[in-house]
């Protein structure tokens, strides 16, 4: 997909870069697969901010995505590729031969009119879903389950791809985009191919307002705050942070400090993403 730049009629348009998507559906989404969403503004049930930089943004309907692909052995035709405001990837509307319609994450190269199928004996073709034990080593996949039957959890964003590098016993070894090598049960399902809209990372919003449309509020530096608001705050004029290492607003070291606590799944990580 080509990139589109704009005439510099304003500072915001001067630096904006958009991905041209002529193949996307121009009309409304499939109404039966929509659900309502309410905004919290980053507040919990007490009304206190628990997630910073969240608030505002355009109203959106949630698109119900089929992450499980549990309609086995029934072929489906791709009706159209659609935009989804809730994720960076595009979505594909499938129409099964029995008349049911479902949304899936659109893989790269999938287009209207293509046929896909899910099942243990599905052919190795873009958009098809099958267990890792039946996928050849070296194949690029996305939408991978971490537990059999739970639904896709890994590699769902635009341009995401994972390579199946080995299979031994009840586990398959995957190489993630981050460099991490991870073991996953061979009964877990994955979809062939990589996620589409892979040029999403080349987009530039161009102005702060485009970020606000997406529900993202400004991020303020700690050094620009008062001492009551942040450990880096206070001081006369542009003072240093006053700490031997930079910290979060709650005093936890940042910039490289490991915060992962889930030792239960550490055994499945063969190689850390940091090398």
From Swiss-Prot:
Alphabetized, the UniProt keywords read: Ribonucleoprotein, Ribosomal protein, RNA-binding, rRNA-binding
Q: Where is this region: Disordered?
A: 224-275
Gene3D superfamilies the UniProt entry points to: 2.30.30.30, Nucleic acid-binding proteins (2.40.50.140), Ribosomal protein L2, domain 3 (4.10.950.10)
Q: Which domain of life is it from?
A: Bacteria
State what this protein does: One of the primary rRNA binding proteins. Required for association of the 30S and 50S subunits to form the 70S ribosome, for tRNA binding and peptide bond formation. It has been suggested to have peptidyltransferase activity; this is somewhat controversial. Makes several contacts with the 16S rRNA in the 70S ribosome.
The gene that this protein is the product of is rplB
GO BP:
cytoplasmic translation
Under the heading InterPro entries, the entry gives:
NA-bd_OB-fold (IPR012340), Rib_uL2_dom2 (IPR014722), Ribosomal_uL2 (IPR002171), Ribosomal_uL2_bac/org-type (IPR005880), Ribosomal_uL2_C (IPR022669), Ribosomal_uL2_CS (IPR022671), Ribosomal_uL2_dom3 (IPR014726), Ribosomal_uL2_RNA-bd_dom (IPR022666)
Q: How does it assemble?
A: Part of the 50S ribosomal subunit. Forms a bridge to the 30S subunit in the 70S ribosome.
NCBIfam families referenced in this protein's UniProt entry, alphabetically: rplB_bact
Q: Which Gene Ontology cellular component terms are annotated? A: large ribosomal subunit
Name a GO molecular-function annotation: transferase activity
Q: Among its keywords, does the record have DNA-binding?
A: no
The record's Pfam families line, in alphabetical order, gives: Ribosomal_L2 (PF00181), Ribosomal_L2_C (PF03947)
Keyword presence, Transmembrane: no
Annotated organism of origin: Xanthomonas euvesicatoria pv. vesicatoria (strain 85-10) (Xanthomonas campestris pv. vesicatoria)
Q: What is this protein called?
A: Large ribosomal subunit protein uL2
UniProt similarity note: Belongs to the universal ribosomal protein uL2 family.
């Amino acid at each position: 997909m080509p990139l589109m730049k704009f005439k510099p009629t304003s500072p915001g348009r001067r630096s904006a870069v958009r991905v041209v998507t002529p193949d996307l559906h121009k009309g409304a989404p499939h109404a039966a697969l929509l659900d309502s969403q309410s905004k919290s503004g980053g507040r919990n049930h007490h009304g206190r901010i628990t997630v910073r930089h969240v608030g505002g943004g355009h109203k959106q309907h949630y698109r119900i995505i089929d992450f499980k692909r549990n309609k086995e052995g029934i072929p489906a035709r791709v009706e159209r590729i659609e935009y989804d405001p809730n994720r960076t990837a595009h979505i594909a509307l499938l129409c099964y031969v029995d008349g049911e319609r479902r949304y899936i994450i659109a893989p790269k190269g999938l287009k209207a009119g293509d046929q896909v199928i899910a099942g243990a004996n599905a052919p190795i073709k873009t958009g098809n879903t099958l267990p890792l034990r039946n996928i050849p080593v070296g194949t690029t996949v996305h939408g991978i389950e971490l537990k059999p039957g739970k639904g896709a959890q890994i590699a769902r964003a635009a341009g995401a791809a994972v390579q199946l590098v080995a299979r031994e016993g009840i586990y398959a070894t995957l190489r993630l985009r981050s460099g991490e090598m991870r073991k996953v049960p061979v009964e877990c399902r994955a979809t062939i191919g990589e996620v589409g809209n892979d040029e999403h990372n080349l987009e530039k919003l161009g102005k702060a307002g485009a970020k606000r449309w997406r529900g993202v509020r400004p991020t303020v530096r700690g050094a620009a705050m008062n001492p009551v608001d942040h450990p880096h705050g206070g001081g006369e004029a542009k003072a240093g942070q006053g700490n031997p290492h930079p910290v979060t607003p709650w005093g936890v070291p940042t910039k490289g400090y490991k915060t992962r606590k889930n030792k239960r799944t550490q055994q499945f990580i063969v190689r850390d993403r940091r090398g």
